From Swiss-Prot:
GO terms for molecular function: catalytic activity. SUPFAM superfamilies: DNase I-like. The lineage of its organism: Bacteria, Pseudomonadati, Pseudomonadota, Gammaproteobacteria, Vibrionales. It comes from Vibrio parahaemolyticus serotype O3:K6 (strain RIMD 2210633). HAMAP family: UPF0294. It is found in: Cytoplasm. This is UPF0294 protein VP2298. Belongs to the UPF0294 family. The keyword Cytoplasm applies. It comes from the Bacteria. Keywords: Cytoplasm.
Amino acid sequence: MFKRFVLSLAFLIMAAVVSFQVIFTVPEHPQIITQTGSEITEDIRCIEFSGAKALDDNGELNLLVWNIYKQNRANWQSELELFSADKQLLLLQEASMTDSFKQWLVDGSWVSNQVSAFKALGSGAGVISIAQKQPIKACAYTSKEPWLRLPKSALYSQYRLSNGESLAVINVHAINFTVGTEEYTSQLSALETLLKQHSGPIVFAGDFNSWSEYRITAMKQALREANLREVQFSPDHRTQFITGLPLDHVFYRGLTLKNAKAPQSDASDHNPLLVSFTLND
């Protein structure tokens, strides 16, 4: 009986491993996928662009931050079209590079940089930063979930602004399944370190998976040295964990906050964040 149980357990483990390998493909190094029109390129870690133009619109900078739930809801496209209107920058998490999503990027004349954290059934998944203009540079970063072993991703980008400054942007999907906060803090601290050599304006935003008070404290401590301010939303319908704590955040520096809203949407398991800034003189 015991031998049969052991054999059954071994079979289940082997089946789970094989299924994981069939469904998920994890690259050896962080990869960044860039789509400009219908042209798609893949690079290891970083990509730089020459002749980047100003991202803002006459000093106005409007952005959408949204965990889009791998476009699993039927109305993702219509809602994304609605929320991306008049935006110069879209910071999405859990974006899946399906054919329909690629076509949406082409139709909107967007330039996108995605971290290919892993592929699920052939479609790349990870954070993606989408803009009306090319960045100066973009670099991919990944951190593995301690239990699931699938990477969470972050993208560091720099964009030119019309006032002569450059904007540093970090789009993050933070590690989720941990007992303590060690891995969580390590991921955010490593990203915050990227900002130490940047003297201009900053946006640090995404799905921080901040579902406990310990994580909230770790998040704020990790970002303290960059002197970032947290955006307050009105209305604030940010998706909350059962603890009542919001999961998504936007931090900034060197910009003037104009308004910030977190409306409701049934197109994802997260609600979108809509934020408007103006450049400082």
